[in-house]
Regions:
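A metal-dependent hydrolase metal-coordination microenvironment
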Residues: 2-121, 125, 132-135, 139-142, ...
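C-terminal functional module detector
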Residues: 1-7, 11, 171-176, 181-317
Length: 317
């Protein structure tokens, strides 16, 4: 349970980027579902490369299973794009979508449009790993968001996408961000997930929450409360060593700092309270859109991220 901006909502642990033997994963769909069920997950989306799975044939092991696919249309400068397509029909993938991308062509917007037309959500997967710049991602219209963390790409140092996320928010794009495993092998399991905040675990509620950004993403730390009222942002969470309010202003707020006494003890914090007007007190810059997100880090180095809120004009100084 979480108090999410004035509403008490249930929380559901989700992995929305999953591969199986249908494409290049080690585990069969049933095997990967059991692994996540045994770990306490509530929602799964199997997103094999260029192929959907027949959901009715897969044992969900008590979880909500959503149909999905990962597609790779041409359009990148360095590599093809990776688009995470959530809640698409089993017959969604056409021959053109499944074909190898042709260098010099760009079909990314076509895929995003097709996903939206089918009632799905299209997230840009691991943009840093793919070598995409923020302006290239921003050029796509209709994206549901991006991945802020991707477990499987951590081995080459490109697992985190915080800077690109902030650049997109600075452009005024209201992008929530997922943490995912992108599981292919055992070493990809359980490294990052999204916590969906909604009334019940039904496809309708879960998908509506994803569309609205009613979730947070994490590698371990948990948010217990998020609030923004009268210009005051508040958060409560499990113990962490650092809690930061991040914005597109040079000013921010840190609710914990390294131990200055040098006694070997690690300070911890479980809440923060911040008046967003302090962001603008010393700034004279003209900024198109101002936002705030909360970022936690615990003693094990694991992050959690709230989705950005956009600050009304009345609180900007």
């Amino acid at each position: 349970m979480i108090e999410f901006y004035g509403k008490k909502l249930n929380t559901y642990r989700a992995n929305l980027h999953t591969h199986s033997t249908t494409s290049d994963g080690k585990y069969t769909p049933d095997e990967v579902m059991k692994l996540y069920s045994d770990e306490g997950y509530d929602v799964m989306c199997i997103t094999d490369h260029r192929k959907t799975n027949r959901i009715a044939d897969i044992d969900p092991h008590g979880m909500l299973l959503i149909s999905g696919v990962e597609l790779h249309p041409a359009g990148g400068r360095i590599s093809r794009s990776h688009l995470l397509c959530v809640n698409v029909p089993e017959d969604f993938v056409t021959e053109e979508m499944a074909a190898q991308p042709v260098p010099g062509e760009n079909h990314m917007q076509e895929i995003v449009d097709a996903v939206n037309a089918a009632g799905g959500l299209c997230f840009f997967a691991h943009p840093y790993w793919c070598g995409f710049r923020s302006e290239e991602v921003a050029a796509l219209h209709g994206l549901a968001g991006i991945e802020v963390y991707n477990t499987s790409t951590r081995y080459i140092g490109r697992a985190y996408n915080m800077q690109l996320w902030d650049e997109l928010c600075d452009m005024g794009l209201r992008f929530p961000a997922l943490a995912v495993d992108d599981v292919h092998r055992a070493h990809d399991l359980f490294g990052g997930w999204s916590v969906i905040c909604c009334e019940e675990r039904t496809p309708e509620c879960v998908l509506a929450a994803l569309r609205a950004g009613s979730f947070y993403s994490t590698q371990g730390p948990q948010f217990k409360r998020l609030s923004f009222e009268n210009g005051i942002f508040e958060a409560e969470f499990t113990p962490v060593t650092t809690a930061i309010c991040v914005s597109n202003q040079c000013r921010g707020y840190c609710a914990a700092a390294p131990n200055k006494d040098g006694d070997g003890k690690t300070p911890e914090v479980t809440s923060l309270r911040f008046d967003v007007r302090n962001l603008f007190a010393a700034s004279k810059a003209v900024i198109n859109c101002d936002y705030l997100r909360c970022q936690l880090r615990d003693a094990q180095g694991r992050y959690a991220w709230s989705n950005p809120i956009f600050i009304p004009e009345e609180y900007r100084g």
